[in-house]
Amino acid sequence: IRDRGCTMLVSEDTDLTAKDLSGGIGEIALLDICEEPEALAARLRDVQQYVMEHSPHRIPALFHCEALGGPVVPHTVLYPNSIGLGATFDTALVRDMTNTIRTQMRAMGILHALSPVLDVAKDLRWGRVNETYGGDPTLSAAMSCAFVQGLQGDDLSTGVAATAKHFLGYSQTVGGLNLTRTQADARELREVFAKPFEAAIRKAGIRTVMNSYSEWEGRPVCASRKLLTNLLRSELSFDGLVVSDYRSVQRLLDDILATADDITDAALQCLTAGLDMELPDRLGYADGMTHAFAEGKVDISYLDRAVLRVLTLKFELGLFDEPYPQWQQYHAAAFAPTAAAEQRATRESIVLTKNEGNTLPLTDRSIKLAVIGPGASSLRLLYGGYTQPSMLEMFQVVQDSSAMAGVGDKSTAKPVRKYDLAATDREIHKSRPEAKTIFEALQELYPNCTYTQGCDYLDPTQTDFAAALAAAESADAVILCLSGKNGWGRHCDTGEGNLSLIHI
């Protein structure tokens, strides 16, 4: 049972005896990572040694983190969000990107990436569109295959296991809301939303799949045999590991659907449907499940099947041969300068919708330039969710805020404070000192350049339109940087939160 469970590790976790590691653990979720890569590798070596010493069979843990445009670790590679990469139509660029991510994660000892996002974004109200490659299933399929091929490599024993998420129909929910019902019939589900997953399975050999938070035909996806076994395995021929999106099992108790009597019942529903491993902690796949098997409430073959899939993936990754981070082997190549490649990807991701009168480029560097808008002066607003800069604020419980689904509870919370965007920018600058705001970059090119905020990115009452108009009228050209903020909580205007429908 323990090898099919997981526990979370955050920066403050220095006492391993206080963690759920006694008897071993299947995976460890790395969240709120503050260490630089070499220090993190050293820390994970110590954690792995502790896990193996406390495992009856010395089974190593598998570490995982998000890696959509780079590992969520300071001083690692950081590419544009997937929606920008989709705009490049450049599969070779994506493959090169994930090849770099692969070597960096290998060096640090993180062999499981909870990426890519293969949801097809048809409803632009859905807050996680930026994590996808857009609304074309064929483009998403091509990009996802490139992502997986670069990340897993030609031989998985030197690669990182990719995760196709979120299976299935997560982006096509009622009203574009998170954690709600998928609005797609069986045909559309297969022909549109399953297409990128099938490509990643058949053409790229992806090794793990993560369930969607949504429900389909009255069943939560994590407990749907129709989706996780009949469709995913029998029709699409997936033979790898299925992991839960964070605390999906618990949702069988918490939400309006409420299909389970207790957490053990919820876990058994998920296990028999085809969910092999529970992330990010052991709530259902725990002692209650052990007792259920001992009492003969469910066939032991379901447990054997899941354990085999977990151990198979660990063997494929070479974890039993080399369980520790391979810093010496990989770090030189992994952390060679990548700025040129990242800048190329960023340039290719930018879409010019029109250029009337050949206004661009602004070749005269002496012009008076007015830069207006909240997006020009903040580093944080440049980054989407599931990037290292946005993860810096994930566990900061903000007044009147909702957190990322699956992690916003008291066990991971930091002290409550009012959200401070400038403070987040300062933290980003510490981990990425080379980063510049749009205004800072423009100042280097146009000496006669001024900045006016004009409005807030979120609060409609915080405006100074008069100052913005005055700046525009006195300038030769205006660069207007309107922006939202993508991430978790009510201090963001797009992204993922734990609110779905209003609960009474």
What are these language model-derived features?
Residues 1-502:
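Glycoside hydrolase catalytic-domain context in secreted enzymes
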